[in-house]
Amino acid sequence: MASKKKTPQKSISPKTHGVINGAGDIVEQPIVSTIRENYMPYAMSVILSRAIPEIDGFKPSHRKLLFTMYKMGLLTGNRTKSANIVGATMKLNPHGDSAIYDTMVRLSRGYEALLHPYVDSKGNFGKFYSRDMAWAASRYTEAKLAPICNELFRDIDKDTVDFVDNYDNTMKEPSLLPVAFPSVLVNANTGIAVGMASNICSFNLKEICETTAALIRDPDHDIKTTLPAPDFIGGCQIIYDEKTINQVYETGRGSIKLRAKYEYDKSANCIDVLSIPSTTTCEVIIEKIIDLVKQGKVKEISDI
């Protein structure tokens, strides 16, 4: 009787522990070249996207939002739900609905953080001077572009700026906005990235335009004659120091001190604080006063 033919066994390859085709090989190279080739491009990208605004005064997230609202017809039309704007903006900005809505809030009239807001808002958009006053969800609020945005998009359809592909190459978006005034100096802007941060204060729109026209006529124009000092939101008093102002204008670096405004209500025997510096919040000030009272450094305060 013929014997059954044996099937040859396949050779068993050694276990690779998930390493395929040399994926686990160690490549040695100088740390300097590694940083130059990988880290430096990343650092430059986030610095230009987060820390330093472009010449039009906007970061990419701002520009993508405003351009989306412009394409939606919100420059002249009625307000629409903020959720609609956020959803449309995600075609240009893939960072998620929460980040987009936060950007819209900070550009809105209701948030009160800008001298000249770009978003005409309706509903609860919180307040920049309150840490605990949260804004409503995007499904409850409405928005459109403010009238000043006419000066941001003027002649944008006449090849005044370059257009680039969005993140998935399905749409075009402007690399800059054709602003008709120095918006980078009109509204305050802050940002932080890799090893670099910026905190640009705001200036009066009329004074900025007059100064720009004067510099065009005379490059040696003394800026301080038409632009004496920054103009901050909230209406605080500036503690003017000519040396500091000169340093800010000449180097772009320096600090300007602000003082809150108040009035004494004699009938109620209380102090009414009318405005506070834009770099702090009501809650921070209240907590600081409470600490001073507990330490015995401030007395005769019964309520706050």
Predicted segment positions?
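Catalytic phosphate-handling regions of large nucleic-acid enzymes and associated NTPases
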Residues: 2-252
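Gly/Lys-enriched N-terminal cap/neck module of very large, oligomeric protein machines
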Residues: 255-304
